[in-house]
Amino acid sequence: MPQVETDDATLYVEVDGTGEPVTVVAHGLTNNRNELAAFTPFVSGTHVRFDFRGHGRSSAPETGFAFVDFARDLDAVATAYGATRAIGTSLGAGAIASLLARAPDRFERTVWLMPAGLDGPFPFKDRYDAMAAELEGKTAEEALEAILFAPERAAEYLRMPWKREVDRLLWDHDHPDGVARAVRGVIRDWPVPDREMLRGVTSPVLLICVEGDEIHPAELGRILHGLMPASHLLVYPSEGSLFAGLPELVQRVNAFLLGDDEAADDLG
């Protein structure tokens, strides 16, 4: 079983693809390595998908769930596999930001999908504290059942029946208590101490956002775009338009990671 050991965590890793470039793929909070697994086969090179601490099949230390800790996970996996590119969703994007704020040249190119935080307090703590409390003390099977049969998800599953199976994959965690600790740690922290630190990131960055997402506001993407001189911003008008445009988006991301900045021409 492929693993990367850090000072305080054992990180589970899966690799697909071959050759260059090598891209490390970092998932969002409460998700796991499966998050983008359906799309990485359409991206050139080698893709290193891993579970952050507390998530999936990785270990769940008692402490160490700040953004700098998730950035250490990202850096450790990238170093172990020689990754020169990184893709991160939400928490994963925050981990990239945290790492680049301290080491601006760490990656040659990065993709930030649905960034959720920068240098200020998270505005939805109560909602996520309730989620953490729901997970705490449950077995893996009990936690998965609680998510799949949560009343607030019923309407969503009626609209999009396929979403239940996606959630079944993404909420596959060995340590629900670890996920709860991760949630509590992240919502009480922020990716960078000062947004101005990101002005030092001169490598190409592709930012992908959706209008109307309160957790991952498109305005944050615009702020990040203004901070990083070599960044490109894609803003989709709705979640539906993002899903409808996924084949084209995957092609854009692939071209961008291969060095084609024109593939990242702004949508918004």
Locations of regions flagged by a protein language model:
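Gly/Ala-rich beta-loop-alpha elbow adjacent to hydrolase catalytic centers
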Residues: 88-96
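Conserved HGGG/HGGXW glycine-rich cap/lid loop of the alpha/beta-hydrolase fold
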Residues: 7-59
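Active-site loop/oxyanion-hole signature of alpha/beta-hydrolase fold enzymes
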Residues: 49-87, 251
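Catalytic active-site module of serine/aspartate enzymes centered on a nucleophile-bearing elbow/loop
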Residues: 230-268
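Flexible "cap/lid" loop of the alpha/beta hydrolase fold
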Residues: 97, 101-137
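Conserved alpha/beta-hydrolase catalytic His-Asp/Glu region
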Residues: 122, 138-184, 188, 197
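Conserved alpha/beta-hydrolase "acid-adjacent" motif
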Residues: 214-220
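Short beta-strand/loop motif that positions the catalytic acidic residue
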Residues: 201, 207-209
